[in-house]
Amino acid sequence: MYIRWGRATCPERSKYIYKGQMVGPDYRVPGGGSNYLCMHDDPDYSSKAFSGKFFSNLQAAFYGSGSLLRHRQIPCVVCESKQRVTQLMIPAKTKCPMGSGWVLEYEGILMSPWTGNSADRDTYRGSYVCVDKDVESTTNRTSENAGHRLLPVSAACTGDGIFADCPPYRTDVALSCAVCSK
C-alpha cells in the first residue's frame, strides 16, 4: 500500500483504494502534525464527533513556484501493490535496486514544504514526499496566499560541509525520487 502524490490514478499494476487531496498542517500556527495526509474526496463524520471552536487545522497543499501547475491543488491516490507488501521511497534515484525483486511504482520529484519567511523556517518542519513527475492538479482551484506550499528539494552544496557529498549532488537542481515495492 502506498500513496501516489501528485496524481489521481494508480498505475495499471496497482489496485485503486481511494483518491483525494493532499493536505498538511497550517504552517502559520504552532501545533498540529508534521506529516501529509491524503484526504478522501467524500469524508464521513463520526456520530461521536467533537464540536467546539478549538481544533488543529489542516490546509490544502498546492504546488509552489517553479512548477507548471504553480498554485494549483495537489491530488493524491492510495494504491495497493498486488502481491507486494513492502514499499520504499528512495530519494535521488529514478530506478529501484536491481536484482532484488523491487518494482518501480512511480518516478517523481522530491518535495517538501515552503514556509514563506525566515521567522517560520525555525518553527515549522514537514515531511519529504515523492511527487509523481507527471504531476496534475485536482481542479482548476488555485491559491497564491492560503494553503500549504510544496517546492522541489535540492542539495545544499555550499562548500562548508553542510552537504558532504558534492559532487555528485548539485545545488539548485531538483532531486528525483523513486517509489518502489516488493
Each predicted region: which residue ranges?
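Composition-driven recognition of glycine/serine/threonine/acidic- and proline-rich low-complexity segments
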Residues: 1-182
